Amino acid sequence: MPAMELEAWTWPDSLDALAAAPASHRLLFESDAVRVIETRIAPGETTELHTHRWPGALYVLSFAHFVRRDAAGEVQVDTRNGAPLAEPGTVVWSGQLPPHTLENVDTQPIHVIGFELKDSKPESEASFAG
């Protein structure tokens, strides 16, 4: 799969998930090419405003309905509106994410391991494997 350029990034490093939302994001591994982050969001919890500079694959350990809001508080995604939830053991793709919060609006935790690709962006923006 050929590498593609990342989109221009204009947000400060202070909004990076590890810096801005450390209660829900934990670094597991980092190199020049990849960064692996564990994300945990408990039921009823909302993350701090943060970004994800690099696209990557998310390995789902547990998933729940969520609401993602932009920096102005506007709803960007509400999975309760019919979007299918990823099942444990599946892998989903996530593109770069500008400043946002994520609220777990369900009764089970969100727990994913993200593999952020620092120097390339796969062509497909949405794919599932199980």
What are these regions (language model features)?
Residues G56-L58, A71, I110, P122, ...:
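A ubiquitous, low-specificity "background" feature that marks scattered single residues
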Residues M1-T39, P43-L49, Q76-P99, E103, ...:
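A short, N-terminal "cap"/entry segment at the start of jelly-roll beta-barrel domains
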Residues T51-A72:
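Short, conserved beta-strand element in jelly-roll/cupin
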